[in-house]
Each structure stands twice: as C-alpha cells, then as structure tokens.
C-alpha cells in the first residue's frame, strides 16, 4: 500500500457522520456512515470505521478534509470546506454530466446547480424550519414507528397516496396522526408524507 497516496473526506452533519477514502485522488477504497452527528462520538466512529474498512492507519492518510455542520470542530482534519463546494466537487467527480444536486440534510435542504466544468452556478437553501429536511422525515417516521430507511419501500407500494397539506412539521404531525386514526393505508400515508 505504500505506493499510493490516501486522502480522507469526512462530512460531519447534524444527524450523521460520513467518511470516504480515496486512493491517488481517483479511486474510492472505503466509505462509512454512522447515524450520529456533530457533538457525539459519530465523527470518530465514522473515521475509525472507514480506516478499518480500508485496512489503513491514520498515519497512512496524507490529508483529511472536513465538511458539514461540524466541520470546524474535528481535530483530525487538515482543512475544512463548505458543504456546497464539497457537493459540487463530489458530484462532478462521480457524475460529470450531472447539473442539479438536491441535498436533504438533517437541518436544511439545498438545491445546487452546477456548470459544465463542475463549479457551482447557483443554489437555494431552506434552513429556517424543518419542512423539507431530513428532520421532517425523521419526525414522520417516528410517528409511524418506522425507521427512516423504511419510508422509501413503503412509499413505493402506494397505490393512492394521501394528501398531506401541511408543510409545517408540527401541523403535518397532527395531520398524519389524524390519517392514522382514519385507518389510511400505511403505504399511501408514507407516499403522501414523501410528496408533501
């Protein structure tokens, strides 16, 4: 392994921590995701997991870049970069033809437009309330006693998605509870939540 240069990226979000290791800046050799974000053991867990998965030690990592909500708090990082810039660079690296990125995070939602050379040409962001964020979906999954990862499979089975008219998480929560008491099919309810 000594003939390669390894770099590590860590995204420390509000609800999850993700890592990736690149070999010579081109090949993904390992990645990890831990469902715990900034202010928890999540970043260290993701970091240690990705090193273990790659069969590497911290000393073999030439450079570590941090991004995300907790990017300024991670001591193992050599540098930090905004999520917007990292999204642009990462998507352009993986899918150079892609021009639109949609990021539904735990605290905010972003839509990013890329130019043909991979630079950000424009973006919009909602960080004022939970509507349209991962937190909204997390709250709805909790009401339904589902894991957030199960929402997609339930929504895909829906034949008649119900209407959730509230975009506010608090009001949508009341609406979902009401739909449950009316025995609305779970798949139709989840599809309605995902479409709201």
Describe the role of every protein-language-model region.
Residues 121-156, 160:
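Glycine-rich phosphate-binding loop plus the immediately following alpha-helix
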Residues 9-45, 49, 120, 127-128:
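Short glycine-rich, Thr/Ser-proximal phosphate-binding strand/loop in the N-terminal lobe
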Residues 4-25, 99-118:
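Gly/Thr-rich phosphate-binding beta-strand-loop-beta motif of the actin/hexokinase/Hsp70
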Residues 21-23, 73-78, 111-117, 123-125, ...:
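Short acidic, glycine/serine/threonine-rich loops at helix termini
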Residues 174-196:
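Adenine-nucleotide phosphate-binding core of ATP-dependent small-molecule kinases
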Residues 147-179:
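Internal, active-site/partner-interface "lid" segment
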Residues 34-37, 78-88, 102-106, 124-132, ...:
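Active-site nucleophile and cofactor-binding loops and adjacent substrate-binding regions
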Residues 30-36, 54-85, 112, 118-121:
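Short beta-strand-loop/turn "lid" adjacent to the catalytic site in phosphate-handling enzymes
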